[in-house]
C-alpha cells in the first residue's frame, strides 16, 4: 500500500508544482513569424528528466505572468533537434532572448529568478 501511495504522489506532484505543463509550443515557422513582428522572445530548451529544467519551469511559470508582452517558447531538446540546430543550442537548460531577429542574450543553466528576469529584461 505504501508503494502505491508513493507512486501516486510521484505522479501527481510534478503536474501541480510548476504552474504550467512545459511542452514544445512552437516550430521554426512560428518563431520566424514572431521574430518578424519585432516582439521580445524567450526560448528555453529542456528535457523531461532534467532537474535544472524543472527548476527553470517554476521560474518561467511566474515570468509568463510578469512579462505579458514577451513570447515564451519552449522545446524539448532531444525531440526537436531541428530547432536546436537552427538556433545553435547544444544543451538543455539554454535560455535565449531575442528582440525581433536580434539575439540579445544567451545563458545555460540559470535557475535563479533574478538572473533569469535580468536576462529577459535585456530584450525589453
Where are these regions (language model features)?
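Conserved redox-active cysteine motifs that mediate thiol-disulfide chemistry
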Residues: 45-59
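Short pre-active-site segment immediately N-terminal to redox-active cysteine/selenocysteine motifs
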Residues: 38-41, 45-49, 91
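Thiol-based oxidoreductase modules, predominantly thioredoxin-like and allied folds used
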Residues: 22, 45, 64, 69-82
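Boundary at the C-terminal end of the N-terminal hydrophobic targeting segment
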Residues: 17-21
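A short beta-strand-turn-helix
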Residues: 22-40
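Non-catalytic, surface beta->alpha helical segment in thiol-disulfide oxidoreductase systems
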Residues: 99-124
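Structural micro-motif
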Residues: 87-96
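Sec-dependent N-terminal signal peptides
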Residues: 4-13
Amino acid at each position: 500500500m505504501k508503494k502505491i501511495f508513493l507512486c501516486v504522489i510521484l505522479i501527481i506532484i510534478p503536474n501541480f508544482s510548476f504552474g504550467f505543463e512545459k511542452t514544445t509550443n512552437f516550430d521554426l515557422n512560428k518563431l520566424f513569424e514572431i521574430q518578424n513582428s519585432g516582439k521580445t522572445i524567450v526560448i528555453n530548451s529542456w528535457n523531461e528528466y532534467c532537474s535544472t529544467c524543472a527548476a527553470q519551469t517554476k521560474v518561467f511559470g511566474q515570468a509568463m505572468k510578469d512579462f505579458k508582452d514577451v513570447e515564451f517558447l519552449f522545446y524539448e531538446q532531444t525531440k526537436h533537434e531541428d530547432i536546436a540546430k537552427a538556433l545553435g543550442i547544444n544543451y538543455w537548460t539554454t535560455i535565449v532572448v531575442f528582440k525581433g531577429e536580434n539575439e540579445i542574450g544567451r545563458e545555460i543553466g540559470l535557475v535563479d529568478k533574478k538572473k533569469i528576469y535580468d536576462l529577459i529584461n535585456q530584450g525589453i
